[in-house]
Amino acid sequence: MVEDSSNPYYRVLFSELRRRGHIEGKTLAVDRYGQEQMGSGMPSLFEAVVKNKPDVIYAIAAAAFIKTVAATVPVVALSGDPIAMGLVKSLARPGGNITGMSVDVGPLLHGKRIELLREAFPAMSDLIYVNLRTSWDAFLGLAMRDAAEKAGTRLLPSLVDSPASEEDYCRAIVESARVGGNAIMLGDSPSALRFRSAIVVAVAETKLPAMYTFPELVEAGGLMAYSFDLKDLNRRAAENIDAILRGTHPGDIPYYQATTFRLSINLTTAKALGITFPPSILGRADQVIE
């Protein structure tokens, strides 16, 4: 998570912080923690995060971790439903030490992705789902299973262990396509964005249609993506971080609920797969790559 990251959402975050006067190395110090620090488990990660007594934590993490660190440090979280997860009392007045942005990562969002993929490829019956094992074993996996069942789609999970590498993703995609499935869906993990070029190439080798989370994978040659506006969410994260650094209590900052979703499609990739997007998809696409 750096300002010159290949991840466009992190660039937006730091650009907005800079615009508000928080410049890393000058007026802002940033400690970074991720999959690499999870080797010894959640307690050791918690200890590492809070030992330097940060003024605020930006967390894209499990609810248990967010709750634990919030007992000590104000948190801006990018999460699912914070009320259902027990993070806050209400969206309008969180009331505790946590605020942030809520995104629907439940059955409705996954169901919409399945629906759109089926509109593009009506023959879809068996869906290969590629994501981190940790996500599959948690709320995301439950939501995906629920969505697939409601859509009458057989789900074939192909799971990648954390920390995931580019090779892990490519192997999971290619090997799962060999054993069955006639369409692919990539999960919401940021690591899929980091390895987007290799992932798109691996999917292309399978000659199967695929639904992605991030539009950047469609720009890299993927077929289609449907998700919330992550650039907007990271701008809002920077706004919340700025407010907390200037003295506002997180419990007084409303928890934002994302309502904007974007559909991206790649006509060149569709043509290569022999797919013609129906008017129902063409008419609602926010981004069309030709």
Label every PLM stretch briefly.
Residues M1-E290:
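Short hydrophobic alpha-helices and adjacent helix-cap/hinge residues
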